[in-house]
Amino acid sequence: MTGIPTYHVLALSGGGYRGLYTATVLAELETVLGRPIASHFDLICGTSAGGMLALGLAAEIPAYELKALFEEQGSRIFGCRSLPRRLLGFWLTAKHDSAGLKEVLTERFQGTTIGDLKHRVLVPAVNYSTGRGQFFKTPHHPSFELDHRMKVVDVALATAAAPVYFPLARNDRGVFADGGLVGNAPGLFGLHEVKTFLAPKQDALVRVLAIGTMTIGATVRGGASLDRGFGKWRGGLFDLVISAQESSVDHMLRQALGNNYFQIDDKATPDQSKDVKALDRVSIGATNTLKDRGNHAAQRALGDPLFQPFRAHQADAPIFYHGPNKNVPEAAC
């Protein structure tokens, strides 16, 4: 296997405030590894909250700072709601205003663009203007000529515009909804990206490390009403979409990659599920559960022999064809 090109993909799922679990895992891993965790991966994919983390890691923001962003600013993102939103949220308006999220992102990323990022990244969203999935990427292929101009803040708002939780996000490319609608667990997109754009003509070895958010499987109780309008579905409809999508991707990646696929995630106990079931619940209980389980999950992964290839891998410096970090001659583009 020595001479085979090897690509490692980091895939970070969405999950609202439960992204604190993901950020805790990343912070613990980065502390032990002793260098930016992005340097261990040839591509970082992230959806919604995972998209924000992916963008942060690609900018080489320390993982412990991203963890603090969730823990310290969660109440600003999912915090106090106006009276109209308390009365009409879920029904006629989104439950939360996106102003708090935008403020937090702007304070952290300011005017940083996708082209300023130091590592390859892929962030899915749904372009509601076209009705199609859209994948924001660094310019790691000659044909990726536009996204490098986009501000990281705008991409983060697009991938995190969860239906009924936040308003749709508008930027220069259109109107966007949460990336969880097209791929809450983006590992399959990462595998496709490597096979199609990074190593299209090579017999490459691809490994995927997926980190979840303690997503609670969306299920129906035995005695629940089967005749449901929006009043009964509410946020449960979006939860079902991301839960079903995550389980499908997990199954397909296990079949496609075998031991070259490694997932870090946890199932909440019945008691803990009361704290973390809602993706916008910011409370002491939720914070403690997500951090405690994230710390334990990282320790468990570090001791697993199947994790060792991710620990040992050093990604090559990425090639960028456009933007401020362009590092290839014009003729090669």
Curated annotation (Swiss-Prot):
Top-rank taxon: Bacteria
GO biological process: defense response to virus; lipid catabolic process
Catalytic activity: a 1,2-diacyl-sn-glycero-3-phosphocholine + H2O = a 2-acyl-sn-glycero-3-phosphocholine + a fatty acid + H(+); 1,2-di-(9Z-octadecenoyl)-sn-glycero-3-phosphoethanolamine + 2 H2O = sn-glycero-3-phosphoethanolamine + 2 (9Z)-octadecenoate + 2 H(+)
Active site per the UniProt annotation: 48, 178
Molecular function as annotated in GO: hydrolase activity
Extent of motif GXGXXG: 14-19
Membrane-spanning segments: none
Entry keyword annotation includes Zinc-finger: no
Residue numbers covered by motif GXSXG: 46-50
Top class in the EC scheme: hydrolase
Control of this protein's activity: Phospholipase activity is specifically activated upon cGAMP binding, which is produced by the cognate cyclic nucleotide synthase encoded in the same operon. Is not activated by cyclic dinucleotides 2',3'-cGAMP, c-diAMP or 3',3'-c-diGMP.
Disruption phenotype: Deletion of the capV-cdnA-cap2-cap3 operon (plus neighboring gene Q024_03603) results in about 10(4) higher titer of phage PaMx41 in this strain.
Domain PNPLA: 10-191
Enzyme Commission number(s) from the entry: 3.1.1.32
Keyword entries, A-Z: Antiviral defense, Hydrolase, Lipid degradation, Lipid metabolism
Induction: Part of a CBASS operon consisting of capV-cdnA-cap2-cap3.
General function of this protein: Effector phospholipase of a CBASS antiviral system. CBASS (cyclic oligonucleotide-based antiphage signaling system) provides immunity against bacteriophages. The CD-NTase protein (CdnA) synthesizes cyclic nucleotides in response to infection; these serve as specific second messenger signals. The signals activate a diverse range of effectors, leading to bacterial cell death and thus abortive phage infection. A type II-A(GA) CBASS system. Phospholipase that is activated upon binding to the cyclic dinucleotide (CDN) second messenger 3',3'-cyclic GMP-AMP (cGAMP). Degrades phospholipids in the cell membrane.
Family: Belongs to the patatin family.
Protein name in UniProt: cGAMP-activated phospholipase
Organism: Pseudomonas aeruginosa (strain BWHPSA011 / Pa011)
